[in-house]
């Protein structure tokens, strides 16, 4: 326990070798139960050498894009073969469902595709044709910035209403295709989105669009990043002792979704298999919620386990209130916020306790020996 600002705070300390032991390989679990979804985003540019299909219920393959004609396409010709290899995992887990995620960071084309009834229908028909051609099980839309001028993508004020209409049209076409293709029950074509909080809600009709979706993948991460003024837990479950009133966290995001009337079983909580580093950090509170000089970079968990968590130069702290770990290098003034098995188990308990629909993560190749995936799968029992 540490003393700070005259208050006793629940932050524990684990150094070097002990932190390394804490991140050790867990026992191989049984598959996750059917009532909870365990969803892996798999990136086409970073395909894992092996995938434990029996530990997953769904895979979202990233990314397809929207071309200049408003149609769903793979920009990289290698992605078709990558998707085929994911679909082959059904031989080991027949209940596995593989969706194609359309969009992503800096993905353009959504505003135009959603603009008119004609463009929406063209997009929906192309999505159905794309699924049929590749024998995939559904579409996940990752339109991260409807109605917002972020990442240089085209946007319009009417994106807010048009997104709902786009999902409605897509749902209708997917349902018609399910009927035509004799896909029933769990085999029907799925439709999901990646959702966020705060500004995302201001520019979408979350209280209306969710009726067209099978579920929503809440991006419960990136709360602190290169655009925030201070460090903080980028994937904290709750607010830290030192958090400002407006700081973001996963619980607040879930509550915002619930307040919009979205059924809790439709909410899938996302976790991050990577950390974020900040350099030149003010040393107060061991770097937590402090100003910094520059954003240092992203850190996949697999690389962190070997190079950072096990390093004598870093001290691992556990923030009990936020249910989040972080690393602090006092000499280098380097702060790293990340997820580990302990924080993921805490989120899995939260999912169970709140009756949510499961967990997803970005992205599978950033794990090490299934350490984080095992924390999810074992905790979903």
Regions found by a protein language model. Give the residues of each.
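Hydrophobic, secondary-structure "cap" segments at the distal end of domains
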Residues: 297-355
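Bacterial N-terminal signal peptides that target proteins for export
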Residues: 2-13
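Active-site groove signature of glycoside hydrolases
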Residues: 127-157
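Bacterial N-terminal signal peptides
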Residues: 12-21
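Acidic/aromatic/glycine-rich contiguous surface patches that form carbohydrate-binding/processing clefts
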Residues: 276, 339-381
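Glycan-recognition patch characteristic of GH18 chitinases/ENGases
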Residues: 30-131, 158, 167, 234, ...
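Substrate-binding surface in catalytic domains of secreted glycosidases
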Residues: 39, 69-81, 146-307
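Conserved, mostly hydrophobic/aromatic
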Residues: 59, 100, 141, 170, ...
């Amino acid at each position: 326990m540490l003393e700070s600002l005259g208050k006793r705070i629940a932050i524990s300390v684990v150094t070097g070798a002990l932190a390394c032991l804490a991140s050790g390989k867990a026992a191989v679990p049984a598959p996750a139960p059917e009532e909870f979804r365990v969803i892996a985003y798999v990136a086409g540019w970073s395909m894992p050498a092996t995938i434990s299909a029996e530990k997953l219920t769904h895979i979202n393959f990233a990314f397809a894009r929207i071309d200049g004609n408003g149609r769903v396409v793979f920009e990289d010709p290698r992605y078709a073969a990558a998707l085929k290899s994911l679909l082959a995992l059904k031989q080991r887990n027949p209940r596995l469902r593989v969706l194609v995620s359309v969009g992503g960071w800096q993905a353009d084309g959504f505003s135009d595709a959603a603009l008119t009834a004609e463009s929406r229908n063209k997009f929906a028909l192309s999505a159905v044709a794309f699924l049929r051609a590749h024998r995939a099980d559904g579409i996940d839309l990752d339109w991260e910035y409807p109605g917002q001028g972020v990442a240089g993508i085209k946007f319009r004020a009417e994106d807010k209403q048009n997104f709902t209409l786009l999902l409605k049209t897509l749902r209708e076409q997917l349902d018609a295709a399910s009927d035509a293709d004799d896909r029933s029950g769990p085999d029907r074509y799925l439709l999901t989105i990646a959702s966020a909080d705060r500004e995302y809600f201001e520019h979408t009709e979350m209280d209306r669009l969710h009726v067209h979706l099978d579920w929503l993948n809440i991006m419960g991460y990136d709360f602190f990043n290169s655009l925030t003024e201070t460090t903080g837990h980028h994937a904290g479950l709750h607010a830290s002792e030192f958090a400002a009133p407006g700081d973001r966290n996963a619980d607040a995001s879930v509550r915002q979704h619930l307040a919009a009337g979205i059924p809790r079983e439709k909410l899938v909580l996302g976790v991050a298999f990577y950390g974020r580093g900040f350099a030149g950090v003010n040393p107060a509170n061991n770097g937590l919620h402090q100003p910094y000089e520059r954003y240092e970079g992203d850190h996949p968990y697999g690389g962190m386990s070997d190079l950072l968590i096990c390093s004598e130069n870093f001290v691992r702290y556990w923030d009990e209130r936020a249910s989040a770990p972080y690393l602090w290098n006092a000499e280098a003034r380097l702060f790293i916020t990340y997820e580990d098995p302990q924080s993921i188990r805490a989120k899995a308990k939260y999912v169970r306790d709140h009756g949510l629909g499961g967990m997803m993560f970005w992205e599978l190749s950033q794990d090490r020996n299934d350490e984080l995936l095992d924390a999810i799968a074992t905790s979903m029992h």
